[in-house]
């Protein structure tokens, strides 16, 4: 029962990425105002802890399934007891909420997201129609959280919307890849309900993300360097999903899902460029 097992329980890399997203979101919103660094550090720690809470909860609720499908995970392998996992998850969220009190709006959002994470783990993992939207919201919300921490959410709302639609699209594509297993597990998902038409739904959501990505330039938040960067990303989005539209397949879905994840990170870089070279 070493610290490595607890890092595995919270999915350390995911927590670090979410924390980094909040920090970058705050940097963008503050236009690299280094006087806000303390607030950004607090926000990043809160996101790390609340994300860890959500990931630990997922393992707690998935114990029966993981005993069969992922017996190497910390709880089914008995490297961490179920009781200790629960205590640890509560400790994470309690600490995160306490730290979030540095900003009352951050505290309220941390409470909201903690409740959403709990509901997702306990109720909506088998209803992916709702669960996909929850995952997309949580992914994008880290940027707004960073913006709240520095007192400016204008730009981060746009980043949130781009991330939400891109991740929502990606989750549907991932479900298309997993459709056979989801049918066996009696999961509700858009691909199960709509079949190949779900690919067109995912593509439409991705088009929304592409259209929204131009808003920071159109509203005057960022300049031409941002526009050039984000148009490049938008082209990669469309190129990445086009083969799946022509020939829907599980392998194509896997490739498209990977491409969307990579390009979403590049969009974040475009926002950084736009903020720095405003």
Curated annotation (Swiss-Prot):
The chain crosses the membrane at residues 17-37, 40-60, 91-111, 129-149, 153-173, 204-224, 226-246, 257-277. Keywords: Cell membrane, Lipid biosynthesis, Lipid metabolism, Magnesium, Membrane, Phospholipid biosynthesis, Phospholipid metabolism, Transferase, Transmembrane, Transmembrane helix. It catalyses: sn-3-O-(geranylgeranyl)glycerol 1-phosphate + (2E,6E,10E)-geranylgeranyl diphosphate = 2,3-bis-O-(geranylgeranyl)-sn-glycerol 1-phosphate + diphosphate. One of its GO terms (cellular component) is plasma membrane. Pfam families: UbiA. Its cofactor is Mg(2+). It is a multi-pass membrane protein. GO terms for biological process: glycerophospholipid biosynthetic process. Pathway: Membrane lipid metabolism; glycerophospholipid metabolism. Its main location: membrane. InterPro entries: DGGGP_synth, Prenyltransferase_related, UbiA_prenyltransferase, UbiA_sf. Prenyltransferase that catalyzes the transfer of the geranylgeranyl moiety of geranylgeranyl diphosphate (GGPP) to the C2 hydroxyl of (S)-3-O-geranylgeranylglyceryl phosphate (GGGP). This reaction is the second ether-bond-formation step in the biosynthesis of archaeal membrane lipids. This is Digeranylgeranylglyceryl phosphate synthase. It comes from Methanococcus maripaludis (strain C5 / ATCC BAA-1333).
